[in-house]
Amino acid sequence: DELTRVMQKTMPSKRLEQIRDVFVFSCFTGLAYCDARALTREHIITGSNNRPWLRTHRQKTSTPVDVPLLDVPLQILAKYEGCSGNDRLLPIPANQKCNDYLKEIAAICGIEKRLTFHLARHTFATTVTLTNGVPIESVSKMLGHRSLKTTQIYAKIVNDKLAEDMTNLSTRLQHLAM
């Protein structure tokens, strides 16, 4: 899929590699651009499972957010440890610059979809969590949504994709009909 392509593609420059890594980090944490950019060491805590978690507040809504860190974001954090003199965890430039670089990354990876930082949050909700069986209530909490209704928009997208996939499968399996 597209996320795997972005993750596995060798980038032609350090700058694009950093933006790719930050984008992937958000795909696996669900953090919005401004929340990811604001992360410092203090935002990493030991969660109830004795593993590292992110604890922050969504700048947009002031909602508290706790996200258990999977291996991919942990590897990215380790890669950029001490990357900036200002205590930030990740080397994230201005949002417009990020989105310009993401456009380049999409072209390099042969992705026609418009890559933006917000798409990373959407990818976390759909591709990373909901399609892998994470309950919608947990996804909603990690995204910092105040209402489950907001998260249900993502669940509808997943269901629409599921319906499309099953229609395609049905077409391919028609020759097996009894």
For every predicted segment, state its role.
Residues 18-22, 93-95, 112-132:
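Short basic/aromatic active-site micro-motif
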Residues 1-33, 51, 83, 132:
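Basic, Lys/Arg- and aromatic-enriched nucleic-acid-binding interface segment
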Residues 1-7, 29, 38-77:
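Conserved tyrosine-mediated DNA breakage-rejoining catalytic core shared by Y-recombinases
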Residues 11, 50-52, 97, 127, ...:
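Catalytic cores of nucleotide-enabled group-transfer and carboxylate-activating enzymes in metabolic
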Residues 24, 28, 34, 104, ...:
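C-terminal catalytic core of tyrosine-transesterase DNA break-rejoin enzymes
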Residues 59-78, 84-104:
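C-terminal catalytic core of Y-nucleophile DNA break-rejoin enzymes
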Residues 169-178:
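C-terminal secondary-structure termini that scaffold catalytic or DNA-interacting sites
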Residues 58-62, 95, 143-168:
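Catalytic-site neighborhood detector that most strongly recognizes the C-terminal catalytic loop/helix
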